[in-house]
């Protein structure tokens, strides 16, 4: 088979895995209030808003997912090298162990944050905590499985791949990357839209309203399940598309045009994306802008 066709097939598989991982990563951070909006949840009791929202951020998303993916990649690497376990099984076992560590940190982090707010009469809802551990662990498993699988594909002895870095290191680097993408792409669809629905859309989140979050849902008190359900419609898929496009475009041009041609085509793609992003933002601001009351 033509090496270029094989390489493009691997790149397509990597792009698909990256798309799934990106969507799951954003939704996991939404259900657990990790990344920028978590500070707003933490400030809510001080603003007089007692809530039933998970607040588990032990760190920023890049550091957290670098850790989870590094754990999964290291376990998978050891199982493949020492026990000759099949690739899929080794990656799955690594992702399970990473999900267990992830869940442990989620519990301790949430409890620690909530207890620190007890002076503002914020209670610890155990039922809410237990109900949200499944989505946190499940989304985290999907992310680590896809990222470690993507990293493994980079090590295959195929022209354009055969990366010299070992699997655990690649998993850490891609974990940091997906954490950064999820933090920068998906945040606005949680913090600005769902958490501050009582404020006009398009006006940003000034410091004066930090912590003044929405605590009532369509029926009853709002919880993180409501948030992740909302974000699954747009924020999650958009984050997955962004990360999948980054992975695909990063490898596709090198496979097709070679190293020098890939660098040139990559610069052209980046320039086109900058122009497209500017035109899209200007159009959106001019067309929609902030919400205005009827006169």
UniProtKB/Swiss-Prot annotation:
Transmembrane intervals: 4-24, 60-80, 87-107, 140-160, 161-181, 234-254, 255-275
Subunit structure of this chain's protein: The complex is composed of 8 subunits; MtrA, MtrB, MtrC, MtrD, MtrE, MtrF, MtrG and MtrH.
Entries under HAMAP family matching the protein: MtrE (MF_01098)
Chief subcellular location: membrane
EC number of the protein: 7.2.1.4
Described function: Part of a complex that catalyzes the formation of methyl-coenzyme M and tetrahydromethanopterin from coenzyme M and methyl-tetrahydromethanopterin. This is an energy-conserving, sodium-ion translocating step.
Organismal lineage: Archaea, Methanobacteriati, Methanobacteriota, Methanomada group, Methanobacteria
Protein keywords: Cell membrane, Membrane, Methanogenesis, Methyltransferase, One-carbon metabolism, Transferase, Translocase, Transmembrane, Transmembrane helix
Membrane-related topology note: Multi-pass membrane protein
Keyword Ribonucleoprotein: no
Matches recorded under Pfam families: MtrE
Organism superkingdom: Archaea
NCBIfam families the UniProt entry points to: mtrE
Pathway per the UniProt entry: One-carbon metabolism; methanogenesis from CO(2); methyl-coenzyme M from 5,10-methylene-5,6,7,8-tetrahydromethanopterin: step 2/2
Similarity section: Belongs to the MtrE family.
Species name: Methanothermobacter thermautotrophicus (strain ATCC 29096 / DSM 1053 / JCM 10044 / NBRC 100330 / Delta H)
S-S pairs: none
Any single biological process term in GO: methanogenesis, from carbon dioxide
One term of GO molecular function: tetrahydromethanopterin S-methyltransferase activity
Localization (cell): Cell membrane
Designated name of the protein: Tetrahydromethanopterin S-methyltransferase subunit E
Cellular component GO terms, alphabetical: cytoplasm; plasma membrane; vesicle membrane
Record field: catalytic activity: 5-methyl-5,6,7,8-tetrahydromethanopterin + coenzyme M + 2 Na(+)(in) = 5,6,7,8-tetrahydromethanopterin + methyl-coenzyme M + 2 Na(+)(out)
């Amino acid at each position: 088979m033509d090496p270029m066709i094989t390489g493009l097939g691997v790149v397509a598989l990597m792009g698909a895995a990256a798309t799934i991982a990106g969507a799951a990563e954003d939704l996991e951070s939404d259900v657990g209030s990790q990344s920028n909006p978590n500070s707003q949840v933490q400030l809510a009791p001080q603003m007089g808003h007692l809530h039933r929202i998970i607040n588990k951020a032990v760190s920023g998303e890049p550091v957290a997912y670098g850790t989870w993916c590094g754990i999964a990649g290291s376990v998978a690497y050891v199982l493949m090298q020492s026990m000759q376990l099949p690739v899929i099984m080794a990656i799955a076992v690594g992702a399970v162990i990473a999900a267990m560590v992830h869940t442990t940190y989620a519990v301790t982090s949430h409890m620690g944050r909530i207890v620190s707010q007890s002076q503002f009469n914020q209670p610890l809802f155990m039922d809410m905590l237990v109900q949200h551990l499944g989505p946190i662990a499940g989304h985290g498993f999907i992310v680590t499985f896809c990222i470690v699988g993507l990293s493994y594909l980079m090590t295959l002895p195929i022209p354009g791949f055969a990366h010299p870095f070992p699997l655990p290191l690649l998993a850490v680097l891609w974990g940091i990357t997906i954490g950064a993408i999820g933090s920068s792409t998906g945040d606005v669809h949680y913090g600005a839209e769902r958490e501050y629905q009582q404020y006009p859309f398009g006006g940003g989140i000034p410091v004066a309203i930090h912590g003044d979050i929405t605590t009532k849902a369509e029926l009853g008190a709002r919880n993180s399940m409501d948030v992740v359900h909302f974000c699954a419609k747009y924020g999650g898929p958009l984050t997955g598309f962004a990360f999948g496009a980054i992975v695909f475009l990063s490898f596709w041009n090198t496979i097709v045009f070679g190293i020098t041609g890939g660098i040139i085509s990559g610069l052209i793609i980046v320039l086109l994306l900058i122009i497209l992003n500017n035109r899209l933002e200007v159009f959106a601001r001019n067309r929609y802008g902030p919400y205005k009351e009827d006169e």
